[in-house]
Design a protein with these regions (language model features):
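N-terminal targeting sequences that direct proteins away from the cytosol to non-cytosolic compartments
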Residues: 1-55, 59, 63, 71, ...
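Short glycine/proline-enriched loop/turn "hinge" motifs that connect secondary-structure elements
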Residues: 57-59, 128-135
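Coil-to-beta-strand transition motifs
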Residues: 62-65, 133-139
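Conserved beta-strand segments of the P-loop GTPase G domain that flank and frequently precede/overlap
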Residues: 68-70, 111, 140-143
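Generic detector of bulky aromatic hydrophobic side chains
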Residues: 79-80, 135-142, 177
């Protein structure tokens, strides 16, 4: 586990305590996104019941990365536990779930049927990644060409690794979504693939 912590601290995603500068970032409070790519659009995701901001969807022309931040205990990690819960949930929806070792350690590759607007279904593939940090877990779900195109995969992974987390000091139960805040200005919704 120590090697994973050192690797994360060197390669990202980063804890705010590990970075010396927060210039040129889009500040969502607990998640700070360096302004890396003009072709990257950002959409905020709100919790349906509470309307609080809980996730960000980052989209290139051909791929999407959705990121969520979860609280974790001070002296332990939660990604393994989250993987088990996520696997059970997805399998209960008849998804095919494969646990693999990838760029971020243990990951899930998922194939599942999702409904289309016309009532038919389509096979969607999703890659779930997660990185434990000090008192936090950053989870990402990747769809689109980044699942098969190495250049696109590298770009999406670079975006995920560039995120800076400012978890704050508020006590939260383990695996609780850490709420985000809107930055000043407008955030354009991602363009729909054609």
């Amino acid at each position: 586990m120590y090697n994973e912590i050192v690797k994360r601290a060197e390669l990202g995603p980063f804890d705010v305590s590990e970075t010396s500068s927060l210039e040129n970032v889009i500040d969502f409070g607990a998640i700070k996104l360096p302004n890396l790519n003009r072709n990257l659009s950002i959409k905020v995701e709100l919790e349906e019941d509470t309307r609080r901001l809980v996730a960000l969807t980052l989209q290139t022309e051909t791929s999407m990365l959705q990121v969520s931040l979860f609280s974790a205990p001070k002296n332990s990690t939660v990604w393994q536990e989250v993987l088990e819960v996520l696997t059970s949930s997805l399998e209960s929806q008849n998804a095919q779930v494969n646990s693999v070792i990838g760029s971020f350690g243990r990951e899930l590759l998922v194939a599942m049927q999702v409904p289309n607007e016309d009532g038919s279904t389509a096979l969607q593939q999703i890659r779930f990644i997660g990185v434990d940090g000090p008192r936090w877990l950053l989870r990402g779900s990747i769809t689109g060409e980044a699942l098969t195109n190495l250049t696109e995969q590298s770009e999406i992974e670079r975006v995920f690794r560039s995120i800076v987390v400012d978890r704050g000091t508020e006590a939260l139960p383990p695996r609780e979504l850490v709420p985000l805040t809107m930055p000043p200005g407008n955030i354009a919704p991602p363009a729909r693939p054609q």
